[in-house]
């Protein structure tokens, strides 16, 4: 889901921490993007009836007219020979080129950020792998325009996992807003988040404390500490305690949730993942045939039983709104385990990677800002009001979501013929054509962002907040609000809040840290090599 191929991007210069609103227009394509190796450490809301406020920003809906002043250009690219073309593109995507180079090389070849290509998995899982690729910040938002695209069964792209993996139901993520159950199920999630908002800060702090105890012990006894596994355990504990008031360790599930979820997620996403096996093995077992759901049935049942018990009051509410307890439970499971936990599995290591690589100067500034605000505004405690006085911390979170969005791939199918615009040209899209956006290119568009491939910690401070509409990790602009009428993440504000709490809790306790960064099939693999406790 989130890009795991971003480890060679330019690192932040810790001596240059200035806001970066749009600068002088850059060349028309991304051919000038720098690739420098950087291996050194370097409408519901969590906040009530209103979303997180972005000062000075008023979101404008996209124009409904197909009128354009740009030259109409035929969409470049092709799909190759039937059968052969999709397989060749799949091999390029996973092995011959890799994901980043797959998109970049075609962008340079066609001199266009909009072109035609095949997306994995292709034969023999997806019957139609043909897509129109969108790689710039102007064309990409059409994927959020519900008047132009539909989202039915497109959550994972050109294929949909078997409903046997989700209790026989098409889960909310696969429903288009036009479908009746979409409104009921999304409203159920909105209510859950709103009703439990007062538990988020204390339960995050408690779960983060457990995480710190594990990594500190490993550092003291082994000299290094693997971050991902204890962070994944802490993330599930937080979600369970914040949403349901239940400690997993006190249930039959124990500490098994992360391993059970990881296996189940693999069965959902295997056709679009590379897990490090030999090419021939992956092609034969992951990319050409579906893994049998039966192999993960017992694991999934354990998760289902946990949520049947833990989410009892939520299931009661679902019944009152006309949703069966069974369907509601499978949807709650998916929202917590796949959407939320799966997102944190990628986002928390990403925060550690980019902040860790930024170095001591940024660490010191964050520690000073966070501790000062806690004392002056929070009365010594982490509060919502205190976090609003931490502009650098908030910017760091948004910059991480910009440079490495947890969900990199997004799709939409054209409902009608319409004109699609990029920065340089306009293109005729036909009804039924599949549109695909690779978000890490759209959110590093050099026509929007200065130094787009660098992690600029205070990019969104001051005038930089005007760039917030181009942060689109949530399946919509950061300046817009999730509602039952769109497909923006129901937990958008919740995820941002958790990411902020992660940074706050980290620098409340520690002055600085050092890391080693590796890769995994989903996100970065982080090893802590040092943690310096708070000295002021």
Curated annotation (Swiss-Prot):
GO molecular function annotation: allene oxide synthase activity; heme binding; iron ion binding; monooxygenase activity; oxidoreductase activity, acting on paired donors, with incorporation or reduction of molecular oxygen
Top EC class for this record: lyase
Cofactors required: heme b
Domain of life of the native organism: Eukaryota
Pathway it works in: Lipid metabolism; oxylipin biosynthesis
GO biological-process terms attached to the record: jasmonic acid biosynthetic process; oxylipin biosynthetic process; sterol metabolic process
Lyase as UniProt keyword: yes
Main location, first listed in the record: plastid
Binding site for (13S)-hydroperoxy-(9Z,11E,15Z)-octadecatrienoate: 339
Compartments (UniProt record): Plastid, Chloroplast
Alphabetical list of InterPro entries matching this protein: Cyt_P450 (IPR001128), Cyt_P450_E_grp-IV (IPR002403), Cyt_P450_sf (IPR036396)
Keywords for the protein's UniProt record, in alphabetical order: Chloroplast, Fatty acid biosynthesis, Fatty acid metabolism, Heme, Iron, Lipid biosynthesis, Lipid metabolism, Lyase, Metal-binding, Oxylipin biosynthesis, Plastid, Transit peptide
Recorded GO CC terms: chloroplast envelope; chloroplast thylakoid membrane
Transit peptide, residues from-to: 1-58
Catalyzed reactions per annotation: (13S)-hydroperoxy-(9Z,11E,15Z)-octadecatrienoate = (9Z,13S,15Z)-12,13-epoxyoctadeca-9,11,15-trienoate + H2O; (13S)-hydroperoxy-(9Z,11E)-octadecadienoate = (9Z,13S)-12,13-epoxyoctadeca-9,11-dienoate + H2O
Gene3D superfamilies the UniProt entry points to: Cytochrome P450 (1.10.630.10)
Binding site for (13S)-hydroperoxy-(9Z,11E)-octadecadienoate: 262, 339, 345
EC numbers for this chain: 4.2.1.92
Residues engaged in binding heme b: 151, 182, 186, 487, 489
Keyword Chloroplast: yes
Biological role: Cytochrome P450 enzyme involved in the biosynthesis of oxylipin jasmonates, important phytohormones acting as growth regulators and signaling molecules for plant defense. Functions as an allene oxide synthase that converts hydroperoxy fatty acids to unstable allene epoxides. Catalyzes the dehydration of 13-HPOTE ((13S)-hydroperoxy-(9Z,11E,15Z)-octadecatrienoate), as well as 13-HPODE ((13S)-hydroperoxy-(9Z,11E)-octadecadienoate).
Family classification: Belongs to the cytochrome P450 family.
PANTHER family linked to this entry: ALLENE OXIDE SYNTHASE, CHLOROPLASTIC, CYTOCHROME P450 26
Protein name: Allene oxide synthase, chloroplastic
Source organism: Linum usitatissimum (Flax)
